C-alpha cells in the first residue's frame, strides 16, 4: 500500500462515524385495532365494558443495543405521547450509523428530571407542564402514564376510572428487539396497545381492584400497570422511510416601529415558560395602545361599552354579573371569564373557539349581544383619535383590524396574577393559618378510600402554579341542550357539556361561578362537587370515579378548602 493511500485510510478511520436520526412513530392500539377514543367497545378480563378518553405518557432513557450486547445510551431525549392530542412521534438524532439489535426506552423519566424544577423548561419542551399536563403540581414529580376513561359493570351503571402511574420506583423499561438498520435515517413503527395495560400479565378489574390509583407505595394497581406495560408494546417495522416533518418557518414580527422598548413580563418563578407569539413580541408601545383600546368605548356600536365594562380590573377582569350585558341591555348567554394569565392558554372563551388572543379580542366587538359593531366602523372611529398611538406601536399610523387585535393581544398577555397570600407563603414571607393549611392539603390530596386517602381531589383539574390545566371538562352540571359547550366547536360527542377549566387564582373575587354564572358563592360550588355532581356520559373520569353525587365532603372539609381558596387572591384585588 502506498504511503498516500495509507494516510487516506488513517484519515478516514479518524473521522467520526456518520450520524443518523432514528424516528419513532407510535401507533395507539386497543385489542389489536387502532384505538378509538371515547368508544365503549373494549372489555377487561372481567368482562367490564370500558372506553379510553385519555392516554398520555412520557418516554425517556432511550438506548440502542449494539451487536456485542453493549448499549448506546441517548440520555438527553425525552418525548411526550398523547392519543387525544395526536402526539405520537419522537426523533433520536446524532445516532452513530450502524446496525443495532434492540431499542430500549422507559415509560417515565429519571429521578433527577422527576425532582427538577418544571419551570425551567422551554415553552415547547415535553416536560413543560403547560405542554404535557403531566406534572403533579405542588406535590412534585410527573405522572409517567395517565390512563383515564369510563366503564360499565354487569349492572350497566356508568362509572369512571383514572389510573395515574408515577413515582420513581414505577419507571418502567421497555425493550423492543429487532433489526435496526441505521446505516441511514430510519423509522421504527411501534405499537402501544392500551387495552393490554389493563389486561396483561396482571389483569385489572375496575369493580374488584378499584377505579383510581395515584401510585402510592404498595398500591397493587400501580404494580399491575408496571407488570403489564412491557407486554403492551411491540415493534412493527423498521424502515428507511422517514416521516414528513413540518419545518418551522422563520417568523417575522409584524409591523414593529423603528424605535421601541421591550416589555418585561412579570410572572412567578414557579410558572411554566409561556408560548408567547413570536410575530407579536411584547413592546411597551403596543401594550400601552392595547390598554387604551381595552378601555375605549369606540369599540361598541353606540359608544357605551368598552372591554373593561364587562371585565373590570378590580374584579380580576371578570364580569360580576351572572351573564354579560351588551349594547342596549342585551343579555348574553354566558358569564364573562376573568382575564389574567392568558399567556399560558392556547384557546379562548368557555368553548375554546378562538385559537389566539388577537382573534378572541375582535369577536366581542362584532357580537350582536355584546358590542355589536362592524370592524370597518371601529377602524374609522379610531382613525380619528388614535393614529398617533398606532404610529408609536407599529411602523405606520395606519389603523386596521389586524393591528387592533395585535394591540389588544399585547395588553392582555401582560395581565399576570402571581402575588397572593399563598404565593407569599410559598416564598416564606407569610404563613397560612391552620385551617388554610388544612385546605391546601385537602386540595392537593386525592380521594382514594381504597388506599386510605381522603382528600378533596381538586388538583387534577386545578393543579400547578396556574391552578388550571386549560382543558375542557364536563364537571357534573346537567347538560343543557341549548349550550353544549366545546361540542359547538368540535362536534365531537366526547365534548358534549364540556367547558374550559378556569383558574382558581382570584376565585374569591370572580363570582358568580360556572359558564352560566349559576353559583354565587364558593359554598355553593363546594356543595356541587360534594353532593350535586350529575352523572352523564361525558362526565370527566376524575369526577366519575367518585360515588354517586360527588366527593361527599364534611362541613369541616368544605370550610377548609374555601379558606385555602381565599388565599389565592392577588394582593391587587384583596381589598375588593
Predicted regions and their residues:
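Sec-dependent signal peptide recognition
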Residues: 2-9
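A short, solvent-exposed, low-complexity linear motif enriched for acidic/polar residues
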Residues: 20-252
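C-terminal capping alpha-helices of c-type cytochrome domains
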Residues: 375-419, 508, 518-576
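Sec/Tat-exported extracytoplasmic proteins
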Residues: 63-66, 104-107, 151, 198, ...
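N-terminal signal peptide c-region/cleavage motif recognized by signal peptidases
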Residues: 14-16
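Stable alpha-helical elements in mature extracytoplasmic
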Residues: 58, 96, 286, 303-306, ...
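Second-shell loop/turn segments in exported
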Residues: 90-91, 276-279, 296, 366-369, ...
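Short glycine/threonine-rich turn/loop motifs
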Residues: 252-363, 423-541, 574-576
